[in-house]
Amino acid sequence: MSTQQDLRERRRQRLRFQLRRKGGGRPRLSVFRSGKNIYAQVIDDVAGRTLAAASSLDKALREQLKTGADSDAAVAVGKLVAERAVAAGVSLVVFDRGSYMYHGRIKALAEAAREGGLAF
């Protein structure tokens, strides 16, 4: 019988495969959330390097946020990663939500990144 962690890993791998297949070589906006913080990075899988990154642990955001684990933090991280990606010359990405549902903090980050100038 599969454990919860195995199922989460299978879901993440299935989504990553679809992104590679349909992404057309575009960089991906990858999101990771923990119980206390949220992280986002724009990754160029062809070159194997990170183009832009932001998290709720960044000094600029840490001072503004009450906690790194709520939707307000996700919105701030989404705007910051979009700003940094646009500055790096990236505006078209694919959204990699990992094994997380498109709901709550993940949705808030995605919508803020769209408002910040990223298209996906």
From Swiss-Prot:
Any one Pfam family match given in the protein's UniProt record, by short name: Ribosomal_L18p
Molecular function GO labels: 5S rRNA binding; structural constituent of ribosome
Gene3D superfamilies per record: 3.30.420.100
InterPro entries linked: Ribosomal_uL18_bac-type, Ribosomal_uL18_bac/euk
BP terms from Gene Ontology: translation
Keyword match Ion transport: no
GO cellular component term of the entry, any: cytosolic large ribosomal subunit
CDD domains in the cross-refs: Ribosomal_L18_L5e
Keywords: Ribonucleoprotein, Ribosomal protein, RNA-binding, rRNA-binding
Family: Belongs to the universal ribosomal protein uL18 family.
Function of the molecule: This is one of the proteins that bind and probably mediate the attachment of the 5S RNA into the large ribosomal subunit, where it forms part of the central protuberance.
UniProt subunit comment: Part of the 50S ribosomal subunit; part of the 5S rRNA/L5/L18/L25 subcomplex. Contacts the 5S and 23S rRNAs.
PANTHER family: 39S RIBOSOMAL PROTEIN L18, MITOCHONDRIAL, LARGE RIBOSOMAL SUBUNIT PROTEIN UL18M
UniProt-recorded name of the protein: Large ribosomal subunit protein uL18
Organism field: Gluconacetobacter diazotrophicus (strain ATCC 49037 / DSM 5601 / CCUG 37298 / CIP 103539 / LMG 7603 / PAl5)
Lineage, opening ranks: Bacteria, Pseudomonadati, Pseudomonadota, Alphaproteobacteria, Acetobacterales
